[in-house]
Structure formats: structure tokens, C-alpha cells
């Protein structure tokens, strides 16, 4: 067993991969746990164990809870993927419609995208489409970041296949995320 561990460790180093124990040291952001007592949180998945790629929205919604996904309307913007996009850009969906699409296209990676959650009682005609969220907003990297769209409750951002950002995530959903990913980080200005 030790020979196999040494072999795998050497192979990982030669290929340039980072082991999960090393990945904890690479993130510049502080661990999220324990979460402070507050109504919303700005969180970041980077250097987490057990994540084959960071922008698998089906998996993220499953962890947050499909029930939560269905509780909101969703505006999806700034979509880019390495596949034939299942969603037009921009896209307005009920939570049930988003769930159906994400389940129909499992493990689909969004390289860039912003999933903005809206109250279930807001109509598409009431949404200001002049201020569409961008996945490359510099405001994410500031203390106390807020959802980009003025009417959004929170945002999930697929950032260059490297990170998944959660801006203004409600406390209940933040606890689910941190429970699933103990390596989850607090997003703050460094």
C-alpha cells in the first residue's frame, strides 16, 4: 500500500496536479466555517476537495436543494460553455424550468455564467433588462459584494471554470453549501 501511495504521489507531482491536502494551502481566502450569524453570505468554491469542476450547476443546485431552486425565478446571463448551450443568453426561467434543464443536461459545465435568483412573485415584465449581470464583474472581489442586478436576491456565478461564487446567499443555503464543502471559503477583498 505504501508503494502505491508513493507511486501516486510521484505521479501527481510529475503531472503538476495538487493533492487535496496541498489545495487547502493554495486558497488565499479564509475558510467559511464556522459561518458568522448573518442573513446572507458571500462564499467561494476554490481549491475544494471532491469537486471535479467548479461550475457544475446541476450539482450546485442539488446541494443547495432543488426545493430552494424551485422557490425562485432565475435570470441567467453571460453564458459561455464548451458545448452547445442549453440556455439562450439572457434567459428567464421558473425554478421548475431551470431544474428540468439542469437535470436533462447533467454535469454540463458553464465556463462563465451568472444565475440570478429573484422572488417568485416577480414577473418577467418587471425585470430591468438594462442591467444584465456579468460574470466578470470586478465588484465580486470587494468586501460586502452585492448581487449585480438590483432586483436579484442572490447570485451564483460560474467564473472561468475556476471558481463558483455565491453572492448574497441566504443563511440556510450557505449552511447547506458549507456542510457539503468544508473547504468552502468566505469571499472578501484581499
Write out the residue ranges for each language-model feature.
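Low-complexity, charge- and small-residue-enriched intrinsically disordered regions
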Residues: 10-27
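N-terminal interaction modules that seed assembly of large macromolecular complexes
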Residues: 44, 50-103
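Short, Lys/Arg-enriched N-terminal segments with co-localized hydrophobic residues
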Residues: 1-3, 35
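Surface-exposed, low-hydrophobicity interaction/linker segments
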Residues: 83-157
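Short, flexible beta-strand-to-coil junctions
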Residues: 35, 47-49, 77-81, 118-120, ...
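Acidic, proline/glycine-rich low-complexity IDRs
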Residues: 6-15, 145-190
Amino acid at each position: 500500500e505504501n508503494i502505491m501511495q508513493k507511486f501516486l504521489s510521484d505521479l501527481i507531482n510529475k503531472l503538476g496536479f495538487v493533492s487535496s491536502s496541498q489545495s487547502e494551502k493554495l486558497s488565499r481566502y479564509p475558510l467559511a466555517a464556522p459561518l458568522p450569524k448573518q442573513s446572507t453570505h458571500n462564499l467561494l468554491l476554490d481549491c475544494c476537495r471532491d469537486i471535479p469542476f467548479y461550475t457544475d450547476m446541476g450539482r450546485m443546485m442539488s446541494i443547495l436543494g432543488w426545493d430552494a431552486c424551485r422557490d425562485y425565478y432565475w435570470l441567467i446571463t453571460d453564458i459561455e460553455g464548451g458545448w452547445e448551450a442549453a440556455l439562450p443568453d439572457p434567459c428567464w426561467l421558473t425554478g421548475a424550468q431551470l431544474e428540468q434543464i439542469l437535470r436533462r443536461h447533467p454535469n454540463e459545465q458553464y465556463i462563465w455564467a451568472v444565475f440570478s435568483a429573484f422572488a417568485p412573485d416577480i414577473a418577467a415584465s418587471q425585470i430591468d433588462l438594462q442591467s444584465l449581470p456579468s460574470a466578470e464583474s470586478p465588484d465580486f472581489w470587494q468586501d460586502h459584494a452585492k448581487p449585480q442586478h438590483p432586483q436579484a436576491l442572490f447570485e451564483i456565478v460560474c467564473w472561468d471554470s475556476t471558481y463558483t461564487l455565491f453572492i448574497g446567499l441566504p443563511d440556510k443555503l450557505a449552511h447547506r453549501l458549507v456542510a457539503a464543502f468544508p473547504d468552502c471559503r468566505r469571499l472578501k477583498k484581499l
